[in-house]
Amino acid sequence: MATGEAMHLLLDTGHATWGGASPAALARRYHDRISHFHAKDVRPDVRRRSDSEGWSFLDSVLAGVYTVPGDGLIDYVRVLRELQGYSGWIVVEAEQDPKKAEPATYAKLGHANLSRFVKEAGLG
């Protein structure tokens, strides 16, 4: 079993934010161990309602707490600057109800936003 430095990590910006962590700080601290990157954002209005009304994680997801990069509160330029030299895949995620958020529309939005953030971060 791999442990310590031999263990690679998946950086999931949405889950990190949901759990109270800073995705940029995680990217900085574990840069050399990150081998996968799931990019999703958190809608602050849904998160506030979830917190104030005591929703479960599943209820929050079903209510649309997650969205594509650039449609929420995460500073992707900051995260990407911490990932200088990363050469793995970046997976755009949203974990949204397709009846509420049309998948092709949000996939295009996430790709466009992430492409812009990559340029703003000086990576492309």
Locations of regions flagged by a protein language model:
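Histidine-acidic metal/acid-base catalytic patches
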Residues: A2-L11, H15-G124
